[in-house]
Each structure stands twice: as structure tokens, then as C-alpha cells.
Amino acid sequence: GCGGVCAYGESCPSSCNTCYSAQCTAQ
């Protein structure tokens, strides 16, 4: 998704990102 919270529960940057393993990486 873009920003918000990952399925894993950690916070993500407001930019578009993808969750991998247990962390968010900017796409």
C-alpha cells in the first residue's frame, strides 16, 4: 500500500511502499 500501516503492524512512510518479511521498503 501507500503509507499507513503494514500487515505486520509497523508504520510505513507516506510514500508508496511494499511490505516484505517484517519491514517496509520504499518502492
UniProtKB/Swiss-Prot annotation:
Location within or outside the cell: Secreted
Domain of life according to the entry: Eukaryota
GO molecular function: ion channel regulator activity; toxin activity
Modification 4-hydroxyproline, positions: 13
Tissue-level expression: Expressed by the venom duct.
Disulfide bonds: 2-16, 6-19, 12-24
Keywords recorded for this protein, A-Z: Disulfide bond, Hydroxylation, Ion channel impairing toxin, Neurotoxin, Secreted, Toxin
Keyword Secreted: yes
GO cellular component, one term: extracellular region
Domain description: The cysteine framework is IX (C-C-C-C-C-C).
Family in the record: Belongs to the conotoxin P superfamily.
Function: Probable neurotoxin that inhibits ion channels.
Protein name as it appears in the record: Conotoxin Bt9.2
